[in-house]
């Protein structure tokens, strides 16, 4: 869904869904808009105020390259024009400036290993980072956690500052075919078949981590109930819907990124 339509659309409903890509150029713009909006959503909570955090979006044509925010741009000021395109070797393809080096080392192997992943997001949050010190998967103790039932991994390495692609590959391996990887003593990372769903599910992960931190001995949802609920709350479309709500409630006018 383009931000132009989102800005004036009054028909957002349970049946809303992403518009099919018309051409690579249009799809590229949507991915870049969602990326810039994702950064602004993070900023609305104060996440990434110190520059720690990154969102990436695979290019629809240069599938061996991804877009991310130019280093030095405050997340709350992110615009489409502030994104740069780099390939999996780190070469700058389009735009000017650099991207977060840890972001490159973490995200490049994920995009390379997982061709189904369009968007990926990681930052340091009030509950995701404390929970990550457990070096354990999220417990199924909330509805939000069920979105990751059978779809999460744990990277237990002690490289809390990722500075090389080899460590990033180990993170990608820990993620496997899942949607969430807990980076021990570091934070959370989610992926999606769109930038929108990756960001939407990141909020789910943060909320699930909050429950786990605040109520560590709370009741855990049974495997049977989690398996029954997962197809609805864990659907990619649900992640996309969460993103639409976040844009409306946390950003307001989505055209600010254009």
Across the structure, where does each feature detected by a protein language model lie?
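A conserved C-terminal secondary-structure "cap"
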Residues: 2-38, 179-258
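An anion-binding catalytic pocket shared by soluble metabolic enzymes
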Residues: 18, 22-25, 29-121, 128-139
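Divalent metal-coordination and catalytic microenvironments
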Residues: 57, 110, 124, 171, ...
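Short coil/turn connectors at secondary-structure junctions
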Residues: 62-64, 80-81, 114-118, 143, ...
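Short acidic/polar capping segments at secondary-structure boundaries
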Residues: 73, 125-128, 135-136, 159-161, ...
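A general structural signal for well-ordered alpha-helical packing
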Residues: 107, 128, 168-172, 202
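Class I SAM-dependent methyltransferase SAM-binding "motif I" and its flanking Rossmann-like core
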Residues: 126-163, 167
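A contiguous binding-surface segment within folded domains or other stable secondary-structure elements
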Residues: 153-189
């Amino acid at each position: 869904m383009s931000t132009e339509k989102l800005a004036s659309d009054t028909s957002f409903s349970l049946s809303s869904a992403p518009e099919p890509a018309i051409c690579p150029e249009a799809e590229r713009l949507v991915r870049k808009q969602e990326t810039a909006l994702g950064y602004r959503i993070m900023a609305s909570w104060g996440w990434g105020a110190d520059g720690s955090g990154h969102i990436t979006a695979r290019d629809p044509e240069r599938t061996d390259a991804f877009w991310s925010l130019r280093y030095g741009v405050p997340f709350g000021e992110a615009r489409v024009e502030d994104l740069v395109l780099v390939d999996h070797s780190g070469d700058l393809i389009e735009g000017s400036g650099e991207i977060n080096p840890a972001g490159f080392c973490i995200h490049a192997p994920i995009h390379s290993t997982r061709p189904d992943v369009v968007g990926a997001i990681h930052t340091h949050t009030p509950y995701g980072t404390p929970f990550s010190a457990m070096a354990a998967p999220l417990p199924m103790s909330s509805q939000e956690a069920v979105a990751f039932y059978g779809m999460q991994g744990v990277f237990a390495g002690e490289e809390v500052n990722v500075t090389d692609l080899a460590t990033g590959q180990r993170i990608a391996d820990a993620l496997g075919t899942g949607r969430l990887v807990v980076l021990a003593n570091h934070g959370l990372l989610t992926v999606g078949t769109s930038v929108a769903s990756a960001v939407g599910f990141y909020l789910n992960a943060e909320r699930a981590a909050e429950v786990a931190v605040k109520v560590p001995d709370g009741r855990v949802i049974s495997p049977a109930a989690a398996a029954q609920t997962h197809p609805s709350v864990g659907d990619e479309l649900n992640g996309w819907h969460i993103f639409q709500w976040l844009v409306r409630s946390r950003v307001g006018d989505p055209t600010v990124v254009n």
